[in-house]
Amino acid sequence: MTATLLDGKATAAEIKDELRVRVKALAERGVTPGLGTVLVGADPGSQAYVNGKHRDCAEVGVASLRRELPTDATQEQVDAVLADLNNDPACHGYIVQLPLPAHLDTQRVLELIDPDKDADGLHPVNLGRLVLGYPGPLPCTPRGIVELLRRHDVALRGARVVVIGRGNTVGRPLGLLLTRRSENATVTLCHTGTLDLTAHTRAADIVIVAAGVPGLLTSDMITPGAVVVDVGITRVIGPDGKGRYTGDVDPGVGEVAGALVPMPGGVGPMTRAMLLTNVVERAERG
């Protein structure tokens, strides 16, 4: 591989070091940032994901507020937990772990989150704030991508950026972040309806792939020296019958790109660091 690897794990560790200092300053004011998690059911993957969030909290001094409900919890019970977190001054932000059991109204649950305590930054109100340029919690994965590029001195101002994928958690909000005046990139959002995807990616300085299609971006689709960010994560079964996770970027891209954000070890750690950042910022605002 000739591409320079942009290490999200190391960068996230730097951010956590900075957050520890900020959390200590808050403690001197008598404030302890608190992150809440709402977990309904006992799915092992969801439990592991939530446990990882609370390990991150412990690393930087953020308090953990766990709310766990059985799989058969009623809509009213879930609503009550969210109301409690919305009104709890010890909670500065929280997430609802998805997916929820099928009998629950996911959209209703997400919209019940107090937008100011929306640690994921994906509440409709906060996405609207992003569109309008108003302050508010920012979506964690897009924010993490921008922060990772910035901390590795990847020029964004005036850069031609192609984002592949128009999902509400990454693609759409990422385009909004990159076109803010503070970034000033020129963004093309590609998707399943895009004609001649390669023509777009070959013209780009930066290609960010968040489509959930393993190996979608290949080495012949980029210009030599381009920056490539792999956001995709898909579980596939290998020839040996064992499951593994793979990204949207073919390994051969590393021989052509100038810099590569890999999967794993790239965007994932940055997403988690930005979740903590959103909570600490909320505590700092009071």
Curated annotation (Swiss-Prot):
Pfam families: THF_DHG_CYH, THF_DHG_CYH_C. GO terms for molecular function: methenyltetrahydrofolate cyclohydrolase activity; methylenetetrahydrofolate dehydrogenase (NADP+) activity. It catalyses: (6R)-5,10-methylene-5,6,7,8-tetrahydrofolate + NADP(+) = (6R)-5,10-methenyltetrahydrofolate + NADPH; (6R)-5,10-methenyltetrahydrofolate + H2O = (6R)-10-formyltetrahydrofolate + H(+). GO terms for biological process: L-histidine biosynthetic process; methionine biosynthetic process; purine nucleotide biosynthetic process; tetrahydrofolate interconversion. It comes from the Bacteria. The keyword Nucleus does not apply. Signal peptide: none annotated. Pathway: One-carbon metabolism; tetrahydrofolate interconversion. Its EC number is 1.5.1.5, 3.5.4.9. Belongs to the tetrahydrofolate dehydrogenase/cyclohydrolase family. Homodimer. PANTHER family: C-1-TETRAHYDROFOLATE SYNTHASE, CYTOPLASMIC (PTHR48099:SF5), C-1-TETRAHYDROFOLATE SYNTHASE, CYTOPLASMIC-RELATED (PTHR48099). HAMAP family: THF_DHG_CYH (MF_01576). This is Bifunctional protein FolD 2. It comes from Salinispora tropica (strain ATCC BAA-916 / DSM 44818 / JCM 13857 / NBRC 105044 / CNB-440). The lineage of its organism: Bacteria, Bacillati, Actinomycetota, Actinomycetes, Micromonosporales.
